[in-house]
Curated annotation (Swiss-Prot):
Keywords: Hypusine biosynthesis, NAD, Transferase. This is Probable deoxyhypusine synthase. It catalyses: [eIF5A protein]-L-lysine + spermidine = [eIF5A protein]-deoxyhypusine + propane-1,3-diamine. SUPFAM superfamilies: DHS-like NAD/FAD-binding domain. Belongs to the deoxyhypusine synthase family. NCBIfam families: PRK01221.1. It comes from the Archaea. Catalyzes the NAD-dependent oxidative cleavage of spermidine and the subsequent transfer of the butylamine moiety of spermidine to the epsilon-amino group of a specific lysine residue of the eIF-5A precursor protein to form the intermediate deoxyhypusine residue. It is an enzyme of class 2 (transferase). It comes from Saccharolobus islandicus (strain L.S.2.15 / Lassen #1) (Sulfolobus islandicus).
């Protein structure tokens, strides 16, 4: 039997854009190599750079699993530096960001550890990231119980994005996505906000507090942003609801002008997660003349490369 202490030795650490400065020219190396996946990285980098200069509405869309990794700090930094001005993500993002902002520590592990043993040791496994029980559910429950009553005292009904700003305001961790979003007033849109520990705890507390979340106001906000922008672009990392919500709303302005997908999903099963940009064109979610790229690979490798290229 492995000791718990032996597994929980090496914590996951957040990175910032400054950590990538020495790699800012790495895409030029891939441009020389060019073949196969290298071309996608080069094309995606060029599109991102043009999008950031040209599009006034810039979506950062990603799934929650990435927030358990060191990409969390990088996402926060991309927001703080103004590269993106709206986030669309999933409920677990809020869980991981809050947990890690208030003392939760995640650790480096392995995909191959015995999961029954981990359960006995009170450790969750998220891929090869280890999440001790005490770093997750309990932390989030305590945060919601502490802050929601004071938020609800002034606001009996609140849009979800404003609620997340309220929590972000109460975070001091510089690596926090919610903190960065609050500071820059970047809305964090979570269409599936009830799906996770944070959402469940909101539901539980709502039974004791006169408090409601108005998701229609989130829809009104994203509608106003899409309808009023001149051009829109998106970096979409992963699939699922965060990907679909991003491209869904852009159909009402005849589609995204720029789109970069980072994914491991394939299109043969007809899934939204695996669908390429060309399929979104048929749904009016990406313009026929839009600049787009699909990069296949692990986001923990691809995203730092793309982010580094923005510094060159």
């Amino acid at each position: 039997m492995i000791n718990r202490e032996d597994l929980l030795k090496n914590p996951v650490e957040d990175i910032a854009l400054s950590d990538l400065e020495k790699y800012s020219d790495i895409v030029n190396v891939f441009d020389k190599i060019y073949g196969f996946s290298s071309e996608g990285i080069v094309r995606g980098s060029k599109i991102l750079k043009e999008m950031i200069k040209d599009a006034d509405l810039r979506f950062l869309s990603f799934t929650a699993n990435l927030v358990s990794t060191g990409l969390r700090g990088l996402f926060a930094d991309l927001v703080k530096r103004g590269y993106f001005n709206i986030i669309v993500t999933t409920g677990g993002t809020i869980d991981h960001d809050l947990a890690r902002s208030f003392g939760g520590v995640y650790y480096k592990g392995s995909f191959d550890i015995d999961d029954a043993m981990l359960k006995d040791l009170e450790i969750h496994r998220l891929g090869n990231v280890l999440v001790p029980f005490e770093s997750y559910g309990k932390v989030i429950e305590e945060i919601v119980r502490k802050f929601l009553p004071e938020i609800a005292k002034d606001k009996k009904e609140i849009p979800a994005y404003e609620l997340l700003w309220e929590f972000g305001k109460r975070i001091s961790d510089s690596n926090s996505i919610l903190r960065a979003a609050y500071e820059k007033k970047v809305p964090v849109i979570v269409p599936g906000i009830v799906d996770g520990s944070f959402g469940t705890n909101l539901f539980i507390q709502s039974q004791f507090l006169n408090f409601k979340i108005n998701l229609f106001e989130d829809m009104r906000l994203i509608k106003d942003l899409v309808f009023s922008c001149k051009k829109s672009g998106a970096l979409i990392i992963g699939g699922g609801i965060s990907k679909h919500h991003t491209i869904w709303w852009n159909q009402f302005k005849d589609g995204l002008d720029y789109a970069v997908y980072v994914t491991t999903a394939q299109e043969y099963d007809g899934s939204l997660s695996g669908a390429k940009p060309r399929e979104a064109i048929s749904w009016n979610k990406i313009r026929p003349n839009a600049k787009h790229a699909t990069i296949y690979g692990d986001a923990t490798i691809i995203v730092p490369i793309l982010a580094a290229s923005l510094l060159s």
